[in-house]
């Protein structure tokens, strides 16, 4: 259910874009992201920081898009969010409090150096996505950018998640692999 909620704003953004335009889609994205926060809180009694940051960014950039009737703002939102994720991961690693380890370290037990590899891998991924988004958003037609945002970035994130899980599993001590397989 939680994963479905994560995709709700993206699906609504895409559907409204296809039916109307980028401005209606931006407004729908703001509303859908707010709805996502409300439903998540009602179901789980907490809101993750990532969802809150995303909501703030969607609201700010979506509102700017609507007020100035300029799609550049909603396009920049993707780059800014990815850049913030990269910065947060990099800083957490540099101060020896890796976010990914704190989120996943109880389930996936690996050495700190492996968590560092994974963190820097994701920092690189987010920076790459931020830069590619700039290119696609401002060099190609709007419809191409919308498809890239919805399908391309989602697929890339999924592939990188699978690669990360495989890498973590491969570097996990055998006793933890057995324990994980028995769950």
Swiss-Prot record:
Subcellular location, principal: membrane
Entry's Gene Ontology cellular component terms: plasma membrane
Function comment: Plays a role in cell envelope biogenesis, maintenance of cell envelope integrity and membrane homeostasis.
Similarity comment: family membership: Belongs to the YciB family.
InterPro entries recorded: YciB (IPR006008)
Keywords: Cell inner membrane, Cell membrane, Membrane, Transmembrane, Transmembrane helix
TM regions (residue ranges): 10-30, 50-70, 72-92, 118-138, 148-168
Protein name: Inner membrane-spanning protein YciB
Topology with respect to the bilayer: Multi-pass membrane protein
Keyword Transferase: no
Subcellular location: Cell inner membrane
Lipid metabolism among keywords: no
